[in-house]
Amino acid sequence: MTVEANKETLGFQTEVKQLLHLMIHSLYSNKEIFLRELISNASDAEDKLRFAALKDDKLFEGDSDLKIRLDYDKDAGTITIADNGIGMTRDDVIANLGTIAKSGTAEFLKQLSGDEKKDSKLIGQFGVGFYSAFIVADKVEVFTRKAGEPADNGVHWESKGDGEFTIEPVSREQRGTEIVLHLKPEDKEFADGWKLRSLVKKYSDHISFPVVMKSESEEEDKKGEEETVNDATALWTLPRTEIKDEEYKEFYKHIAHDFEDPLTWSHNKVEGKLDYTSLLYIPKRAPFDLYNREAPRGLKLYVQRVFIMDDAEQFLPLYLRFTKGVIDSNDLSLNVSREILQNDSTVESIRTALTKRVLDMLSKLAKKGGDEYQGFWDEFGTVLKEGPAEDFSNREKIAGLLRFASTHTGEATQNVSLDDYISRMKEGQNKIYYITGDNFAAAKSSPHLEVFRKKGIEVLILSDRIDEWMMGYLSEYDGKQFQDVARGDLDLGEVETEEDKKHQEEAAKEHKDLLERIKTALEDQVQEVRVTNRLTDSPACLVVGQFDMGAQMKKIMEAAGQKVPESKPIFEINVDHPLVQRLETEQGEQRFKELSAVLFDQATLASGEQLKDPGAYVSRLNRLLLELAN
């Protein structure tokens, strides 16, 4: 069979076609990032070979001098990026260049709006890698051979970025990957030695491998010689005092494949009982798969400067999965695996220290005030809310970083800290009050807040799906207990006057018969009927039992297909309300039952719950309206 007969034309996966189209149209204003992306990929390939060769040094094939070559041909209008890294087989090429294996890609692409500015940010969050070549090239060729494979197992891939690609076998002596970009007429300016050198310095100065180009020196003996155009020193190994902010930012873009600067970073070298260096970054924007807890995450792990793996998730807890960075340890062995990392006491110690460091970075950002921490919270707050359940030892610190909506601001924006709340507590108030609801508007207008409005007490409004679950793990902050205003007995502390307490006790005695009649009328729908100290304007409300599951948690469990434990609400009535007073005078038992049911259903709706039988509620209401009309 001839080589030509083995040439195949294949179609790109639908998502790739969409991404190519979007990139070519959305990223033209930042074309030069193609070089950073392709050099980053080449650097990853060198890293992977160096790691694989730890177990089998024959993979070096007699050449362990790892470098990335950059070449150009002005007349032909081409740029070539070549590495002598791990290389690819035919199957690797199809998997890596013809499809996108990231989970959630289709959902991500649905978010794109056609607004070029917004889309370029979203694509930046996604990480475009190899496909960025098509921003400047109208044809891309890839020649590659996997390390350890015979020369005849080379692969030649070619595409014009128009929906399909060809792939054929090729003989290739050199292992690794060579990418040839055939530049678009308007982008021929990139086929220039000075331009390429300046882009390498700008974007790829601190990758770990040398990027070499042919010397353009006028001196005869140096012409055509290779020269290294980047620093090629791993950035994290340098003293902090020698690193400019701009270099930190570019290094972040290299490891995170992000287009934007990071929000903040922390570079730290630890010596002594543990010996490691960490460089941690907080991104400005959430990646598209942030809420997928199974998505790859973690830090780039190096052991004694040797790359080991990309997504070492064992060094940070899941609730800090947005953190990017590098960890370089001298205490781990070079043959470390993911399994070993899970059970290593050194890793556990480093994880504890890095978790504290990330939380300290966030605390520092929060103390600065301004928009930066608010921006972080808007992007990553929901994930940080997983923290109290996952990290008992740092619970207080995490709680201090949480932000809430509140009756103080009256707005849905989550910008109130617990310290803010405590600073505004009323004299005699000893608890932090909060309410949970399906959405901000429903929670804000809940009848449970009436007594708090009357007494001028601030209540935190929690309307994210995760909130009720999170509060199950937060019992107190700064010595103050949390209280859900719609759960159990409401303790207002010394804010509730003796007169208030006396009024409630007397009302309970005076209306004992009414409470019993309502309980009988509602049969097994409620666990208790009692006089309220929560309401000032509404006739009645539902209260969740102290140890029962709230509405939010029930919905989460139902959505997960889990059985929800049976529980009945407490029905509280406001005996000073005209409707309740009218109910008390009703002699007819059937009509009393109907009125009690209407009050109960209204209280159910006001608490954000669904009615079990909406039709029956509407019928009762219609009968009452007809009576009024007659």
UniProtKB/Swiss-Prot annotation:
Family matches, as SUPFAM superfamilies: ATPase domain of HSP90 chaperone/DNA topoisomerase II/histidine kinase (SSF55874), HSP90 C-terminal domain (SSF110942), Ribosomal protein S5 domain 2-like (SSF54211)
CDD domains, per the entry: HATPase_Hsp90-like
Keyword terms: ATP-binding, Chaperone, Cytoplasm, Nucleotide-binding, Stress response
A as annotated region, ranges: 1-338
GO cellular component, one term: cytoplasm
Gene Ontology molecular functions: ATP binding; ATP hydrolysis activity; ATP-dependent protein folding chaperone; unfolded protein binding
InterPro entries, alphabetized: HATPase_C_sf, Heat_shock_protein_90_CS, HSP90_C, Hsp90_fam, Hsp90_N, Ribosomal_Su5_D2-typ_SF
Region span, B: 339-555
Residues covered by region (C): 556-630
Subunit structure: Homodimer.
UniProt family annotation: Belongs to the heat shock protein 90 family.
Function: Molecular chaperone. Has ATPase activity.
Designated name of the protein: Chaperone protein HtpG
